[in-house]
Amino acid sequence: MDPFTEKLLERTRARRENLQRKMAERPTAVARSAPHAKRGREPLSEASNQQQPLPGGEEKSCTKPSPSKKRCSDKIEVGAPDLENTEPIDVAKPCSPMPAPRQAKPPAPAAISESVAAPAALLSADRGLNSGSEASATSSVKTRMQRLAEQRRHWDSDLTDDVSESSYFAPVPTEDKAASPSKPPISNASATPVGRRGRLANLAATICSWEDDVSHSSAKQNSVQEQPGTACLSKSSSASGASASINSSSVQQEATCCSPRDGNASVRKDPSSNAAHGPLLSASVSSSVKASSPVTAATFITENREAQNPELLHKTASPLKTEARKPCEKPTLSQGAQPKEEANREVCLQSQSKDKLATPGGRGIKPFLERFGERCQEHSKESPSYRASHKTPNITPNTKAIQERLFKQNTCSSTTHLAQQLKQEREKELACLRGRLDKGNLWSAEKNEKSRSKHLETKQEVHCQNTPLKKHQTVASTPLTSVTDKVAENEPAVKLSSTEPAGSTESEMTKSSPLKITLFLEEEKSLKVASDLEVEQNTEAVREVEMSVDDEDINSSRVINDIFSDVLEEGELDVEKSQEEMDQVGAENSEEQEDALNISSMSLLAPLAQTVGVVSLENVISSPPSELRDSNLSAASPKPGKFQRTRVPRAESADSLGSEDRDLLYSIDAYRSQRFKETERPSIKQVIVRKEDVTSKLGEKKNVFSGQVNIKQKMQELNNDINLQQTVIYQASQALNCCVDEEHGKGSLEEAEAERLLLIATEKRALLIDELNKLKSEGPQRRNKTSVISQSEFAPSKGSVTLSEICLPLKADFVCSTAQKTDASNYYYLIMLKAGAEQMVATPLASTANSLSGDALTFPTTFTLHDVSNDFEINIEVYSLVQKKDSLGPDKKKKASKSKAITPKRLLTSITSKSSLHSSVMASPGGLGAVRTSNFTLVGSHTLSLSSVGDTKFALDKVPFLSPLEGHICLKISCQVNSAVEEKGFLTIFEDVSGFGAWHRRWCVLSGNCISYWTYPDDERRKNPIGRINLANCISHQIEPANREFCARRNTLELITVRPQREDDRETLVSQCRDTLCVTKNWLSADTKEERDLWMQKLNQVIVDIRLWQPDACYKPVGKP
């Protein structure tokens, strides 16, 4: 037995002993009136957490001195005041329970895991009402009576009070019993023989009923657990209510509300049924729903007994006769009254069970007895007889009408009940959902033997219940009972307003299902283990929504969907799965499908019932495509599958056993495995390259570069560029053809710009044609030569050349004359830079009018040519354009304007003059007037190379004699090598230490032109290097492995550097002084041959780049090449 169950049993035992001690200490009571006797009976008045009692009119009678007797009768006895009062106002009083003390922890269903016979012996005959059906097969009537008599012998002299009361209460008409089916006076052992005979007669009738109906133990057990003034709650609901009652804090409110509802309901039922058994009929509705077949069998037996012994029937309210009469009288009563009456009574039951099940007979013991009966029913449920015993009562339109009428009559007293009931439903939701979360995979152990019974139970309780609460009573399904009780202890009480509107009819309440959404809210909270603040916020939202549960003008489902739209996506998964199972089970019974399904605001937890009750792994089925069900549910819906819900597609197969397991992982390892699988990344094979073959890498790079340049593709690109330039030439020519006079732009800056564009396009087209011809003539042979060279030697890296601060000096005489002559011609200059066909740029136009700075024209633009090799050649070409002013005076213009008449001679003259004027342009191969040649003329050129770096003034070639240019061009040229050779690693360096050679392991970093080394890698960021080796000072033609004759260490490379000699230099093992230079021999040893080769490749690349791009910055190599 687990510690939790043992603790519950200990607390129950302590409570019982405390009650016995308290009752023994009470003095012998004299005959008292019913209300006073009722007030005096408070065995648990000193228990912890007791709330203030209600007014005396609403207190419960409790005159029996023994807790054992209370337990024996606490579910079926009729309260003394009930039997005396016949008016409905008085009838209501006994049903209002005293504020039950909040017990620290009610007994959990786990405590009921014992066999059926064992608890009967444990609890003695006082619990025989719960276990009598099982024990009746092995005990006789005489044995039981003896046991009861012996049990009551240790009760003290207080019994006289009870005897007088019981003998006085027994003959009262049973019409008053309708108010509250409380305890019948069956077991008072006192000095008065009448009282004893009456009790024994009652007990005999009860036991006879058990023996006659022993085969239907499960149904009887379920109904024996009824509470006074309440309908017989199904086992799961009772357990759920008992477990959820831990955090209840509204006993008085609920107890107060319970009274008027039951009284009114029973009074209204009397005209339509036997007055003596109205309440008993209503109390049996849920039992008949759960197991109508066995109870009906018991009905015929007990009815025969009633005909034979009517006096005994009035005197004794045997629980089994009560149970048996209910289904028997159901046909006589229109079935609408039953569910409504049961709804009212179940509301009261929920309130009482939530608050420690405060019943008149035994307030502290009821939860344990109920759970014992529930466990017994669990065992009996597994048998086929139990499954076969489920029947569904038929519901007619008259039933619905009576239900609505009764509900309207009771709305005044049900307002507070609704609020309290909704609160209990919230707590049960949380308990069940967290029970699911805690239970995890443990459900799969009971899958084979209990899944079918669970399906039937859920189907009948959700699909076939007539009352609002019955739909909710399946929340605590049997596998969840113990977990529910455990979780309920830590569950925060959800406080709801007690002034909730409750004026809508049954059919109106079926249109809204806010609690379904509330279920998803609570489920999300339990699954995510939200913080208390988040729980309070969600509860506030629930409270706001629940205030309009029964408002007929608001579609609560739509409102809550808006509020909890994000919660629905997660919560609907399990509900949808369960809903499909409900549809399948419901389709098997055509009779049940014809019945109407009444859903009120009290029964909106049906989705929860489906989720929890059908959560076994067999229900994992593929959901159909997503669809939105209708928000409003018709009252005559034949299936429970019409609740409003958003179907969420779930990609799971029917045989996927792990679907629920994936949702509710039960261990950290399982969660981690699931998480890693879900976030599985593509497998990346990480390789730490310490033996990289740089030679092959460089070879591949060069081969790829040469191979990727397809000849045909290159030729196609050149042709496209040629066509593009041809288009530019044509457009520029058309623009220039329009410049015929000053009015049309002749001599303007626009004309000069058009000439510039024409010049650039023409020159570029010529370069592209030249490149195309080279490709056609040489083909791939020329590129193969370069690739062979690059493979045999280390190819230098590409670089970039930057030209800036370009200026073009002019002759001083020309500058002076231009300044004096304002009507002189305009001189435009243009510098064009050519570095092959693909890289050609031109400067903007510079004129003597606006770009003259001193005696030179300045070009502020900076040009950078990228990806040029070390043997680059940049051709600088200077072009000039002279725009002369119009020499015609104003008189000639006037005369020309006068002769406007066109004569044949003038027309011929104009044609011939135009032809002579544009004769130079007509020679274009594009046709007459198609294209033009630029009027820019070349006035100087120069070729720049790497050797030009460092100079700023270059002489121009081909300068005309009368040109205004001085003959030089000034610019600044700079080069940058795009070499990104870097390497890091450990090398062992040979050093001279006091004349002795020593190898020291260093962390070496090759960056730029230097090798810097430290002792440790971390020192690179914190300390200055121990030493540096400048590769620009290397005089070796190529870095090679050290000669083994001089250096025996393997994997060693030799690097010889020189530097100017210093005064303190002297010869060591690694350095020698020659003339004015100090030559140092550096031996660097790698760990492996591959690493040595890698370092050699990197160092050689750096040396090549230095020597080719910075020839003046390094020493020339010495020795053989």
Curated annotation (Swiss-Prot):
Kindly list any coiled-coil regions of this protein: 564-599
- Spans annotated as Required for ubiquitination: 1-45
Top-level taxonomic group: Eukaryota
Alphabetical list of InterPro entries matching this protein:
AHD, Anillin_N, Cytokinesis/Rho-signaling, PH-like_dom_sf, PH_Anillin, PH_domain
Q: Where is the composition biased (Pro residues)?
A: 96-109
Keywords per UniProt: Acetylation, Actin-binding, Cell cycle, Cell division, Cell projection, Coiled coil, Cytoplasm, Cytoskeleton, Mitosis, Nucleus, Phosphoprotein, Ubl conjugation
This protein is called Anillin
Gene that this sequence comes from: Anln
